[in-house]
């Protein structure tokens, strides 16, 4: 499948931060500022709008026994596709960029070629898109004895499993010079000794893009679009052209900038987490008092 993506407008937000002072309105946890919804005037708002928590639940068969594993990651909006009005029930498609090791958790037998996984030993059973946000955007806080202004990490199950739009693996035709052939042989031997199924591992970039279909007939999917994706699209459009972002500054100039990293890492933290399910035995809404994936921001200054 070939997908042409829009300009990487979200990159502009990184550089816009270099001209602003850090905001101290965040909760502090170790070296991070966490669990805060930035206002529209705060420097982290653009990145907050574009970032999402990704949760994959996979069913794995081991020694004849079925087990479930959960993998977490962070994704950010990179593109979208409006529904085709000529096609009945055609979904809105959001494209989220993420790390390749995160996207590798997606095991979808219906995925696009060449990403379709044919391993019968396991597959992704549920996918959730999450964000640290206002509880009232999705449910009444009173249901859980929470105040009206309550905030939590809200994880929402999409009605269908995502697909892989792009994975930056085996995308370069590498031919090794004579002096590197011995090194290549050692690499192949290491791969063989590591018992990996892929004996021809090639260089890759830590980057992938997931396609998230959202159906208007699904009440929960509509909430995902209204409260997660639509604000991200507005922010994306606001950022504008980033094609020439590296055109003028030299590398030495770029080293002087301050860079902010925002996301949903796996950290132990006491913050409420709300889950909205569309399928399974626990279909509906339930709350977990604590979560291990807080919304956080940190910065790096070279």
Swiss-Prot record:
Keyword Lipid metabolism attached: no
Keywords from the named record: Cell membrane, Lipoprotein, Membrane, Palmitate, Signal
Lipid-anchored residues (S-diacylglycerol cysteine): 23
Pfam families, alphabetized: Mycop_pep_DUF31
Gene Ontology CC, one term: plasma membrane
Bilayer topology term: Lipid-anchor
Entry keyword Lipoprotein: yes
Major localization listed first in the record, in broad terms: membrane
Subcellular location: Cell membrane
Lipid linkage positions (N-palmitoyl cysteine): 23
Similarity annotation: Belongs to the MG067/MG068/MG395 family.
Listed name of the protein: Uncharacterized lipoprotein MPN_585
Species this protein is from: Mycoplasma pneumoniae (strain ATCC 29342 / M129 / Subtype 1)
């Amino acid at each position: 499948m070939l997908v042409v993506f829009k300009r990487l407008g979200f990159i502009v937000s990184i550089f816009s931060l270099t001209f602003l002072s850090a905001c101290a309105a965040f909760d502090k946890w170790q070296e991070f500022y966490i669990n805060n919804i930035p206002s529209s005037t705060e420097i982290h708002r653009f990145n907050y709008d574009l970032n999402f928590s990704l949760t994959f639940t996979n069913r794995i068969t081991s020694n004849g026994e079925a087990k479930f594993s959960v993998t977490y990651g962070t994704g950010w909006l990179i593109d979208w596709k409006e529904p085709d009005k000529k096609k009945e029930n055609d979904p809105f498609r959001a494209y989220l960029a993420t790390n390749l090791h995160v996207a590798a958790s997606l095991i979808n037998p219906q995925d696009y070629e060449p990403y379709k996984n044919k391993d019968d030993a396991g597959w992704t059973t549920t996918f959730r898109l999450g964000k640290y946000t206002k509880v009232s955007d999705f449910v009444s806080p009173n249901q859980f004895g929470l105040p009206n202004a309550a905030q939590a990490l809200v994880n929402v199950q999409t009605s269908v499993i995502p697909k892989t739009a792009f994975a930056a693996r085996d995308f370069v035709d590498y031919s090794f010079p004579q002096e590197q052939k011995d090194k290549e042989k050692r690499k192949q031997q290491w791969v063989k000794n590591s018992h990996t199924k892929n004996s021809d591992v090639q260089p890759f970039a830590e980057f992938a893009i997931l396609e998230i279909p959202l159906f208007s007939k699904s009440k929960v999917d509509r909430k995902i679009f209204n409260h997660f994706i639509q604000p991200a699209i507005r922010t994306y459009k606001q950022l504008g052209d980033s094609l020439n972002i590296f055109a003028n500054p030299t590398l030495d100039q770029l080293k002087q900038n301050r860079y902010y990293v925002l996301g949903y890492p796996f950290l132990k933290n006491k913050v409420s987490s709300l889950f909205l399910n569309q399928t399974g035995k626990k279909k509906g809404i339930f709350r977990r008092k604590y979560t291990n994936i807080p919304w956080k921001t940190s910065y790096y200054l070279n």
